[in-house]
């Protein structure tokens, strides 16, 4: 995890978290390059300043440039809140909610043999371990979990062909073996977590429309909380949504109002996911307001560090 610290002339600081993983190498250098246009400016006028920085990076819209802007925006808003001695959520209109529902994200993914050693935990190597993990989720106080696709073959691993990491790329069309293994995995989680726990499934970018239809139809009877599906065509996502009963969550990889609007207009998802470290908390609030106009609820995307968790919590509170 990486952090940006801004210091105003009076010594007030603002801090944000950003991440160079998952397609964002070199982000620190971009932040440093963009910040040269912000030096000496009024940090309280963050909307004006971010509009200027957006204009200066207009021809490199999205991607790493947007993540750099978001890191700066988040630090500016934090600086303003510290200067006024108020929580960030007060700058967003005050707390609408004081308690937030949480789910255990990427449940089991980091306990597969490849990464379990780094966390000093027992590796998950079979379905019995999944059952035990489901019990641990509930005993830890969580009412929901989100998981990925695991294959328990000779070397248990996470199946993620959409990231060119495993078999199935570039066709992005799951085999019967994958569909059956995924069903067994979800049933094992249900056995361990019990009938009342919500189970969410992250399928982001792993398939094309044909593949998503085959997977979601095969699992639609399991009563999952949502299928999480990221792809970049609103019409394709809307087709998938119309084809199943399970809610669809999406859009964690989008940037800004212009990125989200086509998906809202296509009625492509039931839950819109917003990444605060990627969009900036002020812009995220705008996206949430746009979602509300289309009667769509919002959830944060947060699989980073503890500061990002706090940033997302302030966003959700508002």
Q: What are the functions of these language-model segments?
A:
Residues 11, 34, 72, 85, ...:
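Conserved, mostly hydrophobic/aromatic
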Residues 53, 86-100:
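N-terminal amphipathic alpha-helix/helix-capping segment at the start of soluble metabolic enzymes
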Residues 15, 83, 101, 122, ...:
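Ligand-binding pocket scaffold of soluble enzyme catalytic domains
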Residues 2-6:
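Short beta-strand scaffold segments in enzyme catalytic cores
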Residues 34, 48, 217, 223-226, ...:
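Shared catalytic-loop signature of beta/alpha-barrel
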Residues 99, 104-238:
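Metal-dependent enolase-superfamily TIM-barrel catalytic cores that perform enediolate-based chemistry
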Residues 7-84:
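Metal- or metallocofactor-binding catalytic centers and their adjacent structured scaffolds
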């Amino acid at each position: 995890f990486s952090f940006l610290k801004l210091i105003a002339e009076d010594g007030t600081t603002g801090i944000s978290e950003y991440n160079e993983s998952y397609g964002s190498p070199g982000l620190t250098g971009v932040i440093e390059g963009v910040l040269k246009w912000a030096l000496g400016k009024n940090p309280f006028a963050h909307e004006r300043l971010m509009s200027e920085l957006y204009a200066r990076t207009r021809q490199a819209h999205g991607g790493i440039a947007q993540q750099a802007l978001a890191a700066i925006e988040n630090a500016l808003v934090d600086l303003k809140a510290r200067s006024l001695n108020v929580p960030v959520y007060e700058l967003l209109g005050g707390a609408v909610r004081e308690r937030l529902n949480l789910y255990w994200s990427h449940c089991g993914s980091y306990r597969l043999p490849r990464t379990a050693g780094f966390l000093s935990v027992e590796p998950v190597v079979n379905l019995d371990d999944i059952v035990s993990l489901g019990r641990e989720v509930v005993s830890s106080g969580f009412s929901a979990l989100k998981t990925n696709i695991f294959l328990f073959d000779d070397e248990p691993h996470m199946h993620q062909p959409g990231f060119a990491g495993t078999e199935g790329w570039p066709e992005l069309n799951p085999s019967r073996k994958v569909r059956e293994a995924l069903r067994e995995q979800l049933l094992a989680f249900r056995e361990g977590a019990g009938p009342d726990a919500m189970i969410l499934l992250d399928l982001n970018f792993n398939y094309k429309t044909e593949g998503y239809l085959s997977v979601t139809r095969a699992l639609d009877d399991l009563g999952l909380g949502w299928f999480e599906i990221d792809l970049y065509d609103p019409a394709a996502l809307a087709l998938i949504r119309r084809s199943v009963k399970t809610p669809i969550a999406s859009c964690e990889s989008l940037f800004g109002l212009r990125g989200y609007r086509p998906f809202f207009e296509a009625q492509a998802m039931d839950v819109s996911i917003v990444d605060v470290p990627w969009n900036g908390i002020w812009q995220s609030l705008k996206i949430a307001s746009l979602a509300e106009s289309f009667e769509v609820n919002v959830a944060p995307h947060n699989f980073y560090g503890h500061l990002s968790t706090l940033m997302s919590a302030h966003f959700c509170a508002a």
